[in-house]
Amino acid sequence: MARLFTPSESKYYLMALDAGTGSIRAVIFDLEGNQIAVGQAEWRHLAVPDVPGSMEFDLNKNWQLACECMRQALHNAGIAPEYIAAVSACSMREGIVLYNNEGAPIWACANVDARAAREVSELKELHNNTFENEVYRATGQTLALSAIPRLLWLAHHRSDIYRQASTITMISDWLAYMLSGELAVDPSNAGTTGLLDLTTRDWKPALLDMAGLRADILSPVKETGTLLGVVSSQAAELCGLKAGTPVVVGGGDVQLGCLGLGVVRPAQTAVLGGTFWQQVVNLAAPVTDPEMNVRVNPHVIPGMVQAESISFFTGLTMRWFRDAFCAEEKLIAERLGIDTYTLLEEMASRVPPGSWGVMPIFSDRMRFKTWYHAAPSFINLSIDPDKCNKATLFRALEENAAIVSACNLQQIADFSNIHPSSLVFAGGGSKGKLWSQILADVSGLPVNIPVVKEATALGCAIAAGVGAGIFSSMAETGERLVRWERTHTPDPEKHELYQDSRDKWQAVYQDQLGLVDHGLTTSLWKAPGL
């Protein structure tokens, strides 16, 4: 590829659009991976009256917000638009956008849309109850979060939209389309539709045929880091970028986050600690779990896939605990000029490993085929205030998050035979030094903490740089730009103690699931169709 710019031209920058579940960000980086400026706005998804579980994506409003963020980032950086060498977009996975035959976006839903529960159940019965298994073996996805039941819901309930639909993309692709007018999907994000073959990294239209759905709506597939087009004059007026700026194919947020962390080689492993915690392991070739407990997604690195297990609401649970029970600590932390979590970790560091036997019941390990959780609770509390207090419960939550991660990584090892020698811990959770050490002690693995902990936008910027000809390789650039802050080494004695805690927690959790099964308690979350 001919180079449009060279890294020595230090005036040039890269822009990443990061479309998360709750917000949109435009982030500007220099060519050494340093974040220069950001523009950010929260967005809200639309619940449709009388459609339980619906969460539609507001195309018009959210495009306005994206444009405002791009203008804000440029303003905050104090740079002229002509110095943006390229732009790319990443997004939450599973969210889809439909277009009519004139190219106008006509409908979209967010990743959290769960309206199609009945359709999931119907689809599971196809082919003598083997359809979901066929989907999983080919694509690494089950039906619960895939596009197939959502399309079937539209065919049943919004036939006007279904008949008009000419093309389907992901939300990251929609952003690129709004900038360039070019429609395409990339494997890493489109892989979460349950319609993309893991081996070929291309659509598998036979799955739509099997479901009785149209197979003529599938967009061209282009790899992450491919030049898609350029910013149109119309888009330039709205977003502030210069017309003609290269627009590059982006991808899924987790996979691009791994690129930004340098997790680009087979067997490399990461725990991404945000609202949800993802445990991901790179696999050199497609392989799926015979038990269907783990999802498998295309990596942004061609030919590679990622086994991914998800811990539910881990970061959200910590925020709930802080806001519900720690008003005093929030005030003290504010007076001290520190983060509340830092103060809570200092308190929790004085609690012995094992947290006096307290067992939080929140997220289960991932069971992709039958994915649901027990009712939130704390088990084995005591009425001794010296042993059972806020510090103990906070440490117990951190330990439990690490235990669930270790269980998820073990599930991946069981079918992939990949046993990592270390892991990367990133996201907001990795800011906690105690939490990072607990993860090392529970997993028994050295835990490496990067300087840039929110790496999704950086990975997206790397893709933009490859598409613009600035960087020659995504993998090599990811490895070159990542910098490490610290490493946590596991304590063998604590690891042995946590092994016992893990075994007890798994047994107790199974009993708690039984209470949900008997209708006595309410699940933290259930996948559509269960």
Curated annotation (Swiss-Prot):
Q: Entry's HAMAP family?
A: LsrK (MF_02053)
Sample GO molecular function, one term: autoinducer-2 kinase activity
The record's gene field reads lsrK
Q: What is the originating organism of this protein?
A: Escherichia coli O139:H28 (strain E24377A / ETEC)
Which CDD domains would you find in this protein's record? ASKHA_NBD_FGGY_AI-2K
Q: What is its main location?
A: cytoplasm
According to the UniProt entry, what is the EC number of this protein?
2.7.1.189
Q: What class of enzyme is it?
A: transferase
Keywords carried by this UniProt record: Cytoplasm, Kinase, Transferase
**What PANTHER family does this protein's entry cite?**
AUTOINDUCER-2 KINASE, SUGAR KINASE
Q: What is this protein called?
A: Autoinducer-2 kinase
What is the role of the protein in this entry?
A: Catalyzes the phosphorylation of autoinducer-2 (AI-2) to phospho-AI-2, which subsequently inactivates the transcriptional regulator LsrR and leads to the transcription of the lsr operon. Phosphorylates the ring-open form of (S)-4,5-dihydroxypentane-2,3-dione (DPD), which is the precursor to all AI-2 signaling molecules, at the C5 position.
One Pfam family from the UniProt entry? FGGY_N
| Catalytic reactions of this protein | (S)-4,5-dihydroxypentane-2,3-dione + ATP = (2S)-2-hydroxy-3,4-dioxopentyl phosphate + ADP + H(+)
Return the similarity comment: Belongs to the FGGY kinase family.
Q: Does the keyword Manganese apply?
A: no
Query: Localized where?
Result: Cytoplasm
Is Nucleotide-binding tagged as a keyword? no
